């Protein structure tokens, strides 16, 4: 059966009409824009011949400066010059933990961070939009045409709020977002690893502000994401801060510093760091102090941070179920991978020389451009297979009638994704897998595709069993869903055609409704999640009371807990999410002493009949 023809709204039906779509690497420190011309992906330069646009925006009383011009003015005007804004995307004021930033932060009504400037308060979405506008202008001037769409890359560890903030920034800049693409995936595309030797590939991405590690398996031209890890607040900026602190210590400067001095220190540290990638020793001068630092001293400063990235690599490899020596290729991404120590330790960890032939600053933008060119429809008919995408998200039902999306809409096929789930009740030996299609948050608003049951789950405590559910869509659009209990290997599977019976008008209606009811759906999901959590707490507590309540509680204590239980049961019937959450907290507080006594009792029983030396 032929795949349902899917086209993005507004795209021309003409099969060979050239359309311009660009890939944008919206980075913490630097940003780039790239395009595919005549089949070759290239980054676009500004009038001065520079590929890289520093991700810096300076607010002036009568205008803006963006990029290198703004970066150069940062030391003189740190309060109005916003750098590394990507770190603040989707964050609340309470999430900002760095104390050495020169900005004046405030919290908005909804808790989102704002920054005070001479033009008033601005938020990270607005700042990012200015960077995107500059890249869009560069692209339209270089191409002599308007853009039909963009693919913007984000760290794999970005959460929903951070991803939505990125989309909001693009829309504020007047862009049509074809897709957000994980940076490691873009790098793999840039290196053409999809047509290389089958096996395991690691993508090590250390940028200015984020670190991501992705373990991929290539099989028959399909990348399966086996595991991901990383740190959304670790990158080359942290190298700069450590080096800046070292310089300040050598110069006998006492913190806290003025914003201007802080910016001067960071600029100097960044310059010294870059020089140490190619030199053994660099002369350093600041204030009244002059001295030098060698590469070994710098490496001593940053070794703990680099080793921290390797801990993430180790966890990702373990999660993927492979060994480091099984990795065929290691792709290095991000400007911070130019640091010799990073390349050395990563190479030692994986036991092979990392791939560095493509400029690590450009590789993500290049991969995004290749993906954008595919999505906008510029490939010849012989390659149209690459254009087939999943029209609506695929997922499964979780407790409370919620939908957990496994493969998002617009994912290019073939594709594979896996996610772990667990049991809800003690002794649960079977699990119903309900496969769904759609963009809404509730099962009742999505399209049911199939159901099957996984039996033979070991009767363990709630949450102890681990079931891996894998979704795979082949080149013909056939979806296979399998579920496997990890400890026993017992599994079940089903195949279904997601596009069967789906008319284009149905798909468009479902997409429109997902936008129209987005806010309502999120509120409904939050309510259901709290009700499910209440059920979980009540189920667990009732079992504990049945087993140990009479022995460990006085009648008065039991009465207090029963009142708290009844309060939660009553409030759970309503529609006030915050009230349910508060009732759960109140019940937790009412049972805290009971929980402590149960723990003490369990420890005494475990130690009963044992000697002290046996315990040691």
Swiss-Prot record:
Family matches, as NCBIfam families: HscA, PRK05183.1
HAMAP family assigned: HscA (MF_00679)
Protein family (similarity comment): Belongs to the heat shock protein 70 family.
GO MF annotation: an example: ATP hydrolysis activity
Biological process according to GO: iron-sulfur cluster assembly
The protein, known as: Chaperone protein HscA homolog
Statement: the UniProt record of this protein carries the keyword Chaperone: yes
Keywords: ATP-binding, Chaperone, Nucleotide-binding
Function: Chaperone involved in the maturation of iron-sulfur cluster-containing proteins. Has a low intrinsic ATPase activity which is markedly stimulated by HscB.
Matches recorded under PANTHER family: HEAT SHOCK PROTEIN 70KDA
Alphabetical list of CDD domains matching this protein: ASKHA_NBD_HSP70_HscA
Domain of life of the native organism: Bacteria
